[in-house]
């Protein structure tokens, strides 16, 4: 831990990038930060100490109540922080200037906000709706400051909530749509600060019952706390949660994956690649990848995780190889391959990433895909096959096909399974995993089309009165009692058990725009916009059609607001949206490390994956 910390602290030189010409970061020419202003934890009394992973600085500040572009008094983190570079530009948060063919400006005119979209020489002026104006106010009020600089947004900022629990913390997964909204608005400092501060938290000690998880683990969330040093002096500290305080004490597997995805998005949108080229950032990427690619007992290229290790953070029967984790894992692998500098210390890791990408894409495309043809194939499966050429490789019993699926799946649609393990297929439709399979090209082009066809055909089930179902259908009766343990929060058609989550809008929008079907996203966004403002931006909605606000739903949920705004900005800026998704990588189909083509076996992942592209 100390070696990694020292490396990040002294790193001043950036390595060359892979797939691009040399590009070196520009560091501040000012005098170095005054680190004497910081205070070590050992100076605090035992009653004042927090967890050992806390980071300290001045002055006292937490949530910024107004627009955080306004000047504040006190010492800025730029003067002495080791994790945030000095000499950052003070961008106005009243204006956007996106460097692309489409230029979006947000100006104040007669106290009304107007959006100007310039495409070529044509200009179209569109006044922001009341919902958009309110959403920006809520998002900006949710910003958290640390040492005078914005570092994230709280999960929810409901003034009527007397017991916020951990909703007053900055969650990595929750901040992603907020970060994209700010980036698309031309405000990158908050995202840069967030990435660097969470990177420092990565290498700090985390322990549950005297056991420490992998070194590359990113926290699920962090909180800015203020501690008193004496009667007149206070100090701010970053207090991370790696799962030791979470319900069920589950490590956040998706946090590191989201961090890598956001790091790439920051570079793509801002054009500032110096951040990802820093030695400490390169080290952070390697730690996450090494943790994900570590050898184990698993026979599959998918990541093996426990229940509750992602957005669905309560017991919902997704332990094993859930699609959400696999699609984010695949995206993070592609991001890492793009951002890692190739040298003697990283070439083995890059080779391992390439091999894993090839194996993972084949595995998901071949075994997770479900359409009417595949269901009929499973329906006729023979079981107990013992052979390398077995058709039913996972020994799936046809009786596992749920009755609802037979009549539900459309003729022209399909989707990726929620989970796959020996003798087990989870036939539920999980939206986030399927959306990111489209965005990252984990699924084939024809599979991507079929997923959107299914959503269009089953609009009332997936969208209903509020987009979008987190999964479909709900676990009910004995399934709910056995699989969730009778969880009172995950009752049928509520919360993670097929509740409707508006934050998923931005991911649906990105998937639709990639496939050239933005009208689907616009239709869903129109459904949400009718209700979100009046309902005070709830976290989730209940009932089969999403008609009621969730029974335990927090109001003024930040990622609900951010998901709505990001969807609006993506639709208005298709050039920017194109920076956030991946096209099919045909080079991956030529990578095969298994050596099966030299044996008597009939199929290897390279040949089979190419068949998936050209035939399906």
Curated annotation (Swiss-Prot):
Residues with the Phosphoserine modification: 92, 605
Phenotype reported upon loss of the gene: Reduced primary root length and number of lateral roots. Reduced plant growth, delayed flowering, increased expression of antioxidant genes under basal conditions and reduced oxygen consumption in the dark.
Protein's UniProt keywords contain Ribonucleoprotein: no
GO biological process, one term: response to hydrogen peroxide
UniProt xrefs under SUPFAM superfamilies: Six-hairpin glycosidases
A Pfam family per the record: Glyco_hydro_100
Annotated transit peptide: 1-78
InterPro entries, per database record: 6-hairpin_glycosidase_sf, 6hp_glycosidase-like_sf, Glyco_hydro_100
GO cellular component entries: mitochondrion
Organ and tissue specificity: Expressed in seedlings, roots and flowers.
GO MF: endo-alpha-N-acetylgalactosaminidase activity; sucrose alpha-glucosidase activity
Catalysed conversion reaction: Hydrolysis of terminal non-reducing beta-D-fructofuranoside residues in beta-D-fructofuranosides
EC numbers, comma separated: 3.2.1.26
Reported induction: By hydrogen peroxide (H(2)O(2)).
Gene3D superfamilies named in the record: 1.50.10.10
UniProt keyword terms in alphabetical order: Carbohydrate metabolism, Glycosidase, Hydrolase, Mitochondrion, Phosphoprotein, Transit peptide
Family statement: Belongs to the glycosyl hydrolase 100 family.
Function: Mitochondrial invertase that cleaves sucrose into glucose and fructose and is involved in the regulation of multiple tissue development and floral transition. May generate glucose as a substrate for mitochondria-associated hexokinase, contributing to mitochondrial reactive oxygen species homeostasis.
Name by which UniProt lists this protein: Alkaline/neutral invertase A, mitochondrial
Organism: Arabidopsis thaliana (Mouse-ear cress)
Lineage: Eukaryota, Viridiplantae, Streptophyta, Embryophyta, Tracheophyta
Gene (UniProt): INVA
């Amino acid at each position: 831990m100390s070696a990694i910390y020292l490396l990040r602290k002294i790193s001043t030189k950036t390595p060359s990038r892979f797939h691009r010409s040399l590009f070196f970061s520009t560091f501040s020419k000012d005098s170095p930060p005054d680190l004497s202003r910081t205070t070590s934890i050992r100076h605090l009394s035992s009653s004042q100490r927090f967890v050992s992973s806390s980071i300290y600085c001045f002055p006292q500040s937490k949530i910024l109540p107004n627009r955080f572009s306004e000047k504040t008094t006190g010492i800025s983190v730029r003067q002495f922080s080791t994790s945030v570079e000095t000499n950052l530009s003070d961008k106005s948060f009243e204006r956007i200037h996106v460097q692309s063919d489409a230029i979006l400006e947000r100006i104040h005119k007669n106290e009304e906000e107007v959006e100007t979209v310039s495409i070529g020489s044509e200009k179209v002026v569109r006044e922001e709706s009341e919902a958009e104006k309110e959403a920006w106010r809520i998002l900006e009020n949710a910003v958290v400051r640390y040492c005078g600089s914005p570092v994230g947004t709280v999960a929810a900022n409901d003034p009527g909530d007397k017991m916020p629990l951990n909703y007053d913390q900055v969650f990595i997964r929750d901040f992603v749509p907020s970060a994209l909204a700010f980036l698309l608005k031309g405000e990158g400092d908050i995202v840069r600060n967030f990435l660097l501060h969470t990177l420092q938290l990565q290498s700090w000690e985390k322990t549950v019952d005297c056991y420490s998880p992998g070194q590359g683990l990113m926290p699920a969330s962090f909180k800015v706390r203020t501690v008193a040093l004496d009667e007149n002096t206070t100090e701010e500290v970053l207090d991370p949660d790696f799962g030791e305080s979470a319900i069920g004490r589950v490590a956040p597997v998706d946090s590191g994956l989201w961090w890598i995805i956001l790091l790439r998005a920051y570079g793509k949108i801002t054009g500032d690649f110096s951040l990802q080229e820093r030695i400490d950032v390169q080290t952070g990427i390697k730690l996450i990848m090494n943790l994900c690619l570590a050898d184990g007992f698993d026979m599959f290229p998918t990541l093996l995780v426990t229940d509750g290790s992602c957005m669905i953070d309560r017991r919902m029967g997704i332990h094993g190889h859930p699609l959400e984790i696999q699609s984010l894992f695949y995206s993070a692998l592609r991001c890492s391959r793009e951002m890692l500098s190739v040298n003697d210390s990283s070439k083995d890791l890059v080779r391992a990433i390439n091999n894993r990408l090839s194996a993972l894409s084949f595995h998901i495309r071949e075994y997770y895909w479900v359409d009417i043809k595949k269901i009929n194939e499973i329906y006729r499966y023979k079981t107990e096959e013992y052979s390398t050429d077995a058709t039913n490789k996972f020994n799936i019993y046809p009786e596992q096909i749920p009755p609802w699926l037979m009549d539900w799946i459309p003729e022209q649609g399909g989707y990726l399974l929620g989970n796959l393990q020996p003798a087990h297929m989870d036939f539920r439709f999980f939206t986030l995993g399927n959306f990111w399979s489209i965005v990252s090209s984990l699924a084939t082009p024809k599979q991507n089309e079929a997923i959107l066809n299914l959503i269009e055909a089953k609009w009332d089930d997936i969208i209903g009165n509020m987009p979008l179902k987190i999964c479909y259908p709900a676990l009910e009766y004995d399934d709910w009692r056995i699989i969730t343990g009778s969880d009172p929060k995950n009752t049928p058609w509520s919360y993670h058990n097929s509740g409707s989550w508006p934050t998923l809008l931005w991911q649906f929008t990105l998937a639709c725009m990639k496939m050239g079907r933005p009208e689907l996203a616009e239709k869903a966004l129109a459904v949400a916009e009718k209700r979100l403002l009046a309902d005070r931006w709830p976290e989730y909605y209940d009932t089969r059609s999403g008609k009621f606000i969730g029974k335990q739903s927090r109001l003024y949920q930040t990622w609900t607001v951010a998901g709505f705004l990001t969807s609006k900005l993506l639709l208005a800026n298709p050039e920017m949206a194109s920076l956030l998704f991946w096209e099919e990588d045909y080079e991956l189909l030529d990578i095969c490390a298994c050596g099966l083509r030299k044996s008597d076996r009939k199929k290897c992942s390279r040949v089979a994956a190419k068949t998936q592209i050209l035939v399906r």
